[in-house]
């Protein structure tokens, strides 16, 4: 059983919704993730999504685009993300770590090499938002060979037959997009979320994790009524971005604690 599967099994038995913060590698400073992740794990984070900066992040809204631009300006590349995963394990982070990046840099690095190096560093899976299931077989094989889960997105607009194709390839969990459009914090979750998640649930036994728009404890509780977990991304990056100099770790910790209600 993978570390991701073990985490969801434990949380399900405990009756707790998985909380998965998103951190951008190299944001706001080059090694900030090495400070943030251990502190957020102690504050209640159960898994981590670790962003790999990219110059054209199509699925991301303005907040994460700014974070990506700053990380690139800090000199961050894919290799540094792999080093960051290894550094987090050396610092004692036990939660699953799932790097999220766009396909082109991964392909240029080499999919087999990427899966090997990520696994050796201590990563647990990959999220690739622009990799369709029809083109994922090489990446899927590389991940499977090295014990990594490959996580796919499903959206409210995803047809049932495509969900079936995704479910046949996916492992770890299914990333369920809680709205149409790009990432970004929202005041309220989409009213059609329960029906959407039920439609996905009928087609897979994998845990469902809700992302896009999660920004409050109420959102986490609502997502937890219908899904196994919630990803908080733009709202957390906003907190880090708006923190006074030198206070971003403390502000992020307070925010993650608040999400637990």
Swiss-Prot record:
Keywords: Amino-acid biosynthesis, Aromatic amino acid biosynthesis, Lyase, Tryptophan biosynthesis. Its EC number is 4.2.1.20. One of its GO terms (molecular function) is tryptophan synthase activity. Pathway: Amino-acid biosynthesis; L-tryptophan biosynthesis; L-tryptophan from chorismate: step 5/5. The active site is at 49 (proton acceptor), 60 (proton acceptor). It catalyses: (1S,2R)-1-C-(indol-3-yl)glycerol 3-phosphate + L-serine = D-glyceraldehyde 3-phosphate + L-tryptophan + H2O. Belongs to the TrpA family. The alpha subunit is responsible for the aldol cleavage of indoleglycerol phosphate to indole and glyceraldehyde 3-phosphate. Tetramer of two alpha and two beta chains. This is Tryptophan synthase alpha chain. It comes from Roseiflexus sp. (strain RS-1).
